[in-house]
């Protein structure tokens, strides 16, 4: 696991003592590509970029950067599941979504209501849970979820949510921002809990993950590996 906050990181180390918890920025980690089977996270949201020479040319906002880097870290067929800003799916410029679609299939997405994190983080932002499965090879296809689309009520949102209203855990509406601009948000439904809605929504997400088979070369490398001689100096 990776946790930037020292307190949260130490708590995680106590909770998961058999696991390695790195207390550092995600951009500072040096995990090899195609190393993990699955990456799960609640990525930071923000309208700012993070410095990483490998990704700087893409000008990713921080939440999009976390998704892109996670996809590189998992093996083909592996799954990335993240909570991210609704901006990943709803921004006007589709470049980030095209980048992700070239590398992964969107298994499904769930749009959360604007009060989902009100209790824990005192924030009313709209967020999504996205599920990606990494492709074996890069694709040039342009799936519908790359684009925006108007809902039946006339709200411009990601085509996935316009076509799958059952994955929106609330009702689309607009609200005024601090600058007086009208912004699309998701008002929570009455008479049903978020937990109940989530249980129903995840039933619509389907995917298959298989165990990675090691190649003959990788098996041979494991066989011939020997420990270093402690008497030999490492210059």
Question: Where are each of the predicted segments found?
Answer:
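Conserved S-adenosyl-L-methionine
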Residues: 1-41, 46-48, 60, 85-86, ...
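Conserved Class I SAM-dependent methyltransferase catalytic core
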Residues: 2-11, 59-118, 125-132
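Hydrophobic/aromatic interaction determinants used to assemble and anchor large protein complexes
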Residues: 11, 228-235
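Short catalytic/ligand-binding loop motif for oxyanion handling, primarily in non-cytosolic enzymes
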Residues: 47-50, 89-92, 140
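Flexible, glycine-/basic-rich loop-and-beta segments that form/coincide
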Residues: 119-220
């Amino acid at each position: 696991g990776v946790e930037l906050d020292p307190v949260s990181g130490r708590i995680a180390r106590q909770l998961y003592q058999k696991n390695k918890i790195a207390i550092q920025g995600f951009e500072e980690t040096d995990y090899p590509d195609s190393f993990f089977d699955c990456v799960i996270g609640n990525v930071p949201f923000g309208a700012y970029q993070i410095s990483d020479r490998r990704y700087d040319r893409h000008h990713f906002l921080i939440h999009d950067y976390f998704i892109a880097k996670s996809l590189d870290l998992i093996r083909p067929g592996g799954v990335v599941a993240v909570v991210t800003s609704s901006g990943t799916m709803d921004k006007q410029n589709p470049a980030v979504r095209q980048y992700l679609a070239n590398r992964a299939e969107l298994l499904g997405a769930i749009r959360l209501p604007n009060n989902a994190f009100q209790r824990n983080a005192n924030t009313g932002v709209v967020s999504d849970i996205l599920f990606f499965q990494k492709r074996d090879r890069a694709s040039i296809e342009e799936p519908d979820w790359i684009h925006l689309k108007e809902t039946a009520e006339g709200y411009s949102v990601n085509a996935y949510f316009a076509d799958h209203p059952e994955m929106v855990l609330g009702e689309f509406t607009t609200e005024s921002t601090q600058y007086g601009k009208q912004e699309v948000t998701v008002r929570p439904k009455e008479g049903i809990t978020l937990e109940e809605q989530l249980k129903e929504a995840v039933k619509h997400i389907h995917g298959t993950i298989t165990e990675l088979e090691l190649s003959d070369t990788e098996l041979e490398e494991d066989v011939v590996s020997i420990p270093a001689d402690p008497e030999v100096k490492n210059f």
